[in-house]
Amino acid sequence: MTVRVAINGFGRIGRNVVRALYESGRRAEITVVAINELADAAGMAHLLKYDTSHGRFAWEVRQERDQLFVGDDAIRVLHERSLQSLPWRELGVDVVLDCTGVYGSREHGEAHIAAGAKKVLFSHPGSNDLDATVVYGVNQDQLRAEHRIVSNASCTTNCIIPVIKLLDDAYGIESGTVTTIHSAMHDQQVIDAYHPDLRRTRAASQSIIPVDTKLAAGITRFFPQFNDRFEAIAVRVPTINVTAIDLSVTVKKPVKANEVNLLLQKAAQGAFHGIVDYTELPLVSVDFNHDPHSAIVDGTQTRVSGAHLIKTLVWCDNEWGFANRMLDTTLAMATVAFR
């Protein structure tokens, strides 16, 4: 069957989900029947077609009244502020991809369900009372038919969780720290301007800016045994896409750097193929733009100190990789629900 999807919020992730759907050749498995976005439809069409990070969309895009066309596919455009007013029942929506970045509670998910959707997938970390939080490639096999309201976690969680799992399974992690080196985001300023976070009052293109992160909480959600044993900090840097994560962990078993690299390389070629990639090429962040993997391990940067302290550098396209995981998780939810 083809999964009927509606997208709520057509920003960076929402638009990349549509692009990834068509570029990955999964149009026969998923069809987008509606997009709810407060912006005007002409602007939606323009930004879907032309993207500073990802270039021109290869498919023809046009807008006619309340419809957006991708090739010959018609997508209904909505501008509803109230979740309860969305016509999901009328449109026969199987899964809503809520890509607003605003909603993430069970109450918000239930509002989509009340409007007629069968399932909801948030594109960001949700509240603890959701039915499941999925990092595809790690725990999607835990999805059940009764799971209606699900979170796909965050781009950085999807990047680092597979690597942590691999290192923990192999060597036994005792504790760790994470530094996220993240591209600038829409909540920063072009030039100095007011913001509740005084660091984010400053021009995004001119500074490396420390910001708060809940990544440590995201890690312990998947690995409760690491509660109070993982810490994370984050900085935003003057690039518009691609993120690097510096992961340091202390492990129980002694290990060498080449052994760590071999472990991660084999995982990329085997059980985590398509989710984790591995490289030893002398690449920089822009080289990972439009990469569909959740994580790309940079083997040239792996270090081991005292046989028990491992440091790795992991890259991800925080937009494109995550958008592809949204599609993977959507299909996983539909598979368990509708088989």
From Swiss-Prot:
Catalytic activity, as annotated: D-erythrose 4-phosphate + NAD(+) + H2O = 4-phospho-D-erythronate + NADH + 2 H(+)
Binding positions (substrate): S154, C155, T156, R200, T213, K214, R236
Catalytic residues of the enzyme: C155
Pathway: Cofactor biosynthesis; pyridoxine 5'-phosphate biosynthesis; pyridoxine 5'-phosphate from D-erythrose 4-phosphate: step 1/5
Any Gene Ontology biological process: pyridoxal phosphate biosynthetic process
Temperature dependency: Optimum temperature is 50 degrees Celsius at pH 8.6. Relatively thermostable. Activity begins to decrease significantly when E4PDH is incubated at 50 degrees Celsius for 5 minutes.
Cross-referenced InterPro entries: E4P_DH_bac, GlycerAld/Erythrose_P_DH, GlycerAld_3-P_DH_AS, GlycerAld_3-P_DH_cat, GlycerAld_3-P_DH_NAD(P)-bd, NAD(P)-bd_dom_sf
Residues that hold NAD(+) according to the record: R12, I13, R81, N318
Compartment(s): Cytoplasm
Entry GO CC: cytosol
UniProt KW keywords: Cytoplasm, NAD, Oxidoreductase, Pyridoxine biosynthesis
Major localization class: cytoplasm
Pfam families: Gp_dh_C, Gp_dh_N
Coiled coil (residue ranges): none
pH dependence: Optimum pH is about 8.6.
Single annotated GO MF: glyceraldehyde-3-phosphate dehydrogenase (NAD+) (phosphorylating) activity
Function comment: Catalyzes the NAD-dependent conversion of D-erythrose 4-phosphate to 4-phosphoerythronate.
Recorded family membership: Belongs to the glyceraldehyde-3-phosphate dehydrogenase family. Epd subfamily.
Subunit structure: Homotetramer.
Record's protein name: D-erythrose-4-phosphate dehydrogenase
Species of provenance: Escherichia coli (strain K12)
Organism placement in taxonomy: Bacteria, Pseudomonadati, Pseudomonadota, Gammaproteobacteria, Enterobacterales
Encoding gene, per UniProt annotation: epd
